[in-house]
Amino acid sequence: MAVDVTEYHLSVIKSPPGWEVGVYAAGALALLGIAAVSLWKLWTSGSFPSPSPFPNYDYRYLQQKYGEAYVEAKLKRVPPWNDQRTTTRGPPSRKGSLSIEDTFESISELGPLELMGRELDLAPYGTLRKSQSADSLNSISSVSNTFGQDFTLGQVEVSMDYDGASHTLHVAVLQGKDLLEREEATFESCFMRVSLLPDEQIVGISRIQRNAYSIFFDEKFSVPLDPTALEEKSLRFSVFGIDEDERNVSTGVVELKLSVLDLPLQPFSGWLYLQDQNKAADAVGEILLSLSYLPTAERLTVVVVKAKNLIWTNEKSTADPFVKVYLLQDGRKMSKKKTAVKRDDPNPVFNEAMIFSVPAIVLQDLSLRVTVAESSSDGRGDNVGHVIIGPGVSGMGTTHWNQMLATLRRPVSMWHPVRRN
């Protein structure tokens, strides 16, 4: 009997029934199908549409990436910054970061603009408002071959810190590059002077450096300074070239407000972009701007807070100012928004938020041009002056942009001189 059973098993193995082969084949095909579907889902879940070159008005791209409900959601959502406090002054907040659920709940209770106003700590300036969209990207007053460009005369690397115990400001001039590149003159050597504004107090003068466009200064200066003076003083870094007649000629200057650096809390170190002294002095007012970028929502927020000491065009005694903000990509105008008009006010408070959809992959190709203009009856308006902010510009424009990128999700506010057009 045992032999018969063994022979039966051997016969089944050598020549199995047809129905059993079919069951095995169907099971194998089912497993292969499940594996193929799983791999396909993994593949499609990791793929995204290529970035749109027009992220602010190509909603097909946004719908493809975020779903059909994104257009409605983008009108209701607000960036959930991690820090509860968002001013650039003072230590970082110790409160926990806002969760998405908490943010949406706050939006439902307060409304998105009121919540943003609380995050930016703009209560002293009134209610935060939404800016107006501007349809025209080719207005007569803004068309120019150099619309999104700002020129630099070299860079200097500096560092500074404040000793609260001795009330002393320490300034170090580390190095410079491309300092003597001027077409109209040739210089054999140069030096740098550091002064404290507005009193023009000399902080220090570097040694003369010869025959070098890239220079290592490595010099340190100190000046007594009361803590209250940090809010009103500025440092000016001036580079002078020495020509063949031994004359000192200004080849570039940059000014840095101490109030934006938080020196009592942490040292500052960075590259500053030099400008022509004539352009730096040709200011027609100042404007306070706040920038923040939320990478998860790919959203750039610009808040036009206020302006002061505006000088009107054509020696006017009065005018009605407003602000236009252009988003530029590689110098091309991609989007434009503007504030409301303020009537007869050289120190207007705008307090308006402008939100741009910006994929992170194109962030380094972007810049902002902020133009202060005068409203007119024909609707065209005369430009008072402008500010350019971005990675490829100079002065405070690049400092503000880099600080925004260094503190993602946290708005950074800075004053900018408004340069005459």
From Swiss-Prot:
Give the keywords, sorted: Cytoplasmic vesicle, Membrane, Phosphoprotein, Repeat, Synapse, Transmembrane, Transmembrane helix
Residues forming the C2 domain are 152-272, 283-416
**What kind of modification does the protein receive after translation?**
Phosphorylation of Ser-97 is required for mossy-fiber long-term potentiation.
Answer yes or no on keyword Membrane: yes
Membrane topology value = Single-pass membrane protein
Q: Which residues lie on this side of the membrane: Vesicular?
A: 1-18
Note the PROSITE patterns from the entry: C2
The protein's predominant localisation is membrane
Entry keyword RNA-binding: no
What Pfam family is a match, any one? C2
Phosphoserine: residues bearing it: 97, 99, 214
Give the record's GO biological process terms: long-term synaptic potentiation; presynaptic modulation of chemical synaptic transmission; spontaneous exocytosis of neurotransmitter
> Which body tissues produce this protein?
Expressed in the brain, specifically by neurons in the hippocampus, and in the adrenal medulla (at protein level).
Q: Could you tell me the superkingdom of the organism this chain comes from? A: Eukaryota
List membrane-spanning regions: 19-39
Where in or outside the cell it occurs: the entry states: Cytoplasmic vesicle, Secretory vesicle, Synaptic vesicle membrane
Q: Deletion: any effect?
A: No measurable change in basal synaptic strength or short-term neuronal plasticity. Neurons from the CA3 hippocampal region exhibit an impairment of cAMP-dependent long-term potentiation in mossy-fiber synapses.
The residue spans the entry assigns to the Cytoplasmic side of the membrane are as follows 40-421
**Family classification:** Belongs to the synaptotagmin family.
Q: How does it assemble?
A: Homodimer. Can also form heterodimers. Interacts with SYT1.
Biological role stated in the UniProt entry? Synaptic vesicle phosphoprotein that enhances spontaneous neurotransmitter release but does not effect induced neurotransmitter release. Unlike other synaptotagmins, it does not bind Ca(2+) or phospholipids. Essential for mossy-fiber long-term potentiation in the hippocampus.
Tell me the protein's name. Answer: Synaptotagmin-12
| Source species of the chain | Mus musculus (Mouse)
